[in-house]
Amino acid sequence: MGGFSFARCLILIVAASTLAVCTANKKWQSGSYQYPKYTQAPNKIIVGGSEGWHFNFSYTDWALKNGPFYLNDTLVFKYDPPTENTTIPHSVYLLPNLRSFVTCSLTGAEMLADVTQGGGQGFEFVLKKWKPHYFACGQHDGIHCSLGQMKFFVMPMLRGY
């Protein structure tokens, strides 16, 4: 019974991360934090805002600052298709669980969009289920995810509650 199991370590990491985010957010501490405007109709949200879906950007921070997200909201992933020597290819995967998210394992993950689907209007994903959704870039065997760059998760909330 001594020692920590993976689940206990994970709970400890999540709790410490939550505490760190809450204490670091000055607006939260001062009570001046304002939630995004609630609407009855589903929202269309561009992942990363004007930055889009690319390397060297914290999507976890973006999700924390732009949430909450609601059931039937649409996440739009915009990224440039790869070109010779100029654009690094990206894709979008839905990871099956928290363990896959933490370890950036693509085993059992579902490819939602390949390297060509983020151009133009982008690839759209509707949050249809009330469960955590774990997203990551799967290019180069998930190296973008492993570097902590292109991954985030959302837990959609129910509207009107």
What are these regions (language model features)?
Residues 2-40, 44-48, 52-54, 82-84, ...:
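Extracellular/periplasmic metallocenter environments
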Residues 58-64:
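Short alpha-helix capping/helix-loop boundary micro-motifs
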